[in-house]
């Protein structure tokens, strides 16, 4: 074994920003961090966008950051995972969707695509619908109908028309698909058992009943004329030759391309559940091959799931337990779930040999009132744990730069960064004393940008800035490589500990010898 303990120190919300304006990390007096960056191996790491499994350009967050770190691999969120599968081509081999397509061929029936038409990326993404249409075309389907749910909540209130125009152009380009109905998400995507709303969407899709229009564009124009924006568009059936373009019938297939479950459950249940009784279905229950993009609700029968949840096997915590090593997780209340539940891949139960210390966060209305938060207590517990000779690995978090950064109050954020700097110094002294090793990083940025550089308004969100990776008191002569991400940290620690990285971890050690 190597040096002991190995400490992973996470400075929450501590990003690195070239612009020193409204930048608490640059403006604070940080003699410890300044010295560490000069004297020890230091590089900038990526903690946002695709590097952490989020859409390109999206700021990181604490949950995603800790999950990527603990997993030792990039954990793709549903949105990026599906987008990536479309790009890689795996999407077109999806068994559940192929089953829906086969059903259409076997019964000479129609494929219906349901979903929220927007690029909001919260419940769905319009490019995923294009993927489904492309798949239908490749498999020779002709009767393909789209039932659009309009957004206006995760997107601008009247952006729906633009999305419809883009879809119509895309269907022309792909050579398949017709819009059969449109409904605002207020009706089709209720989640509070307001079944009267869902019934209106159901009646448009299944019965061909409701408002009518000659085209999707006519429908949206008429709605805007009445000052009814996307979210609230009354379910409208598109008519061709005095008949609905299409309604959902027995033996048809459905692919519902929303990936977030909560607002997809009710309309799905109204079609799939043979015992459904929340409103009257004039045609009763009839059989369809119904594919949900993700598992909306295990209690909904008669459905298939295209993208099952990926279980994160062999996290760092599990790996340490398998090797009989003792580990400690330490944080104050605000970040306790992050160093435990999220770091363990969404598992609540501690691993064998995993101790946990929770220090209470201060009871103040907002953390600018106490920018040091509970860092001094957390820091003292850390020093004690380092010197105890009890732990092989310590994983801990200082919450200040993030929690105080969220207030947008620069003066307080500077104090928060300074409080953390002092605690880092104490930990470094302790590590040197026992000849342990420490990797310092952050899960995402925040305190390094406290105003919007374009508008001058306070900026309280996370950032897409890089974060520090510093290796303290490890073996002489090691260097860290540039261009790494959070998923590479645990593979680095495993190498530092002289152990073999498990196959499930696809992150790559940052160590350059």
Q: Language-model features: where?
A:
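Feature captures the catalytic ectodomains and active-site-proximal regions of enzymes
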Residues: 1-513
